[in-house]
Amino acid sequence: MIFSMLRKLPKVTCRDVLPEIRAICIEEIGCWMQSYSTSFLTDSYLKYIGWTLHDKHREVRVKCVKALKGLYGNRDLTARLELFTGCFKDWMVSMIMDREYSVAVEAVRLLILILKNMEGVLMDVDCESVYPIV
């Protein structure tokens, strides 16, 4: 029963009108994905993280990128992120130009983890877009 409730919770809270609730939800989904990867590191939950990469509020985007850093920082989990990475890589690369400094910094840190832990995912052109920033 609890697992059933937890399955429905992200769907409701990731679309909440309050950015604070969306940020908390994404942060917790990231924790669940790391702790209970067999149940939560799936496309049905990763889509919420992908959607919030585009959120209009800075704090939500920061929490989203930090959640992704936790996942991409664990080599055991990166193989399960291949489809997600293929879908959202271009957006993650473009986030280094985010108007909010904190989001851009976290995006660069995320790309460094992707470069280290997922060989061949970031192309030269992706890396070249980071060089002027750093």
Swiss-Prot record:
Q: Where found, per UniProt?
A: Nucleus
Q: Which UniProt keywords apply?
A: Nucleus
Domain of life, per UniProt, equals Eukaryota
Q: What is its main location?
A: nucleus
Name the cystine pairs: none
Domain SCD, residue spans: 10-95
* Classification via InterPro entries: ARM-like, ARM-type_fold, Cohesin_Scc3/SA, SCD
> What GO cellular component entries does it have?
nucleus
Q: Which family does it belong to?
A: Belongs to the SCC3 family.
Q: Which PANTHER family match?
A: COHESIN SUBUNIT SA-3, STROMAL ANTIGEN
Q: What is this protein called?
A: STAG3-like protein 3
Q: Can you name the source organism?
A: Homo sapiens
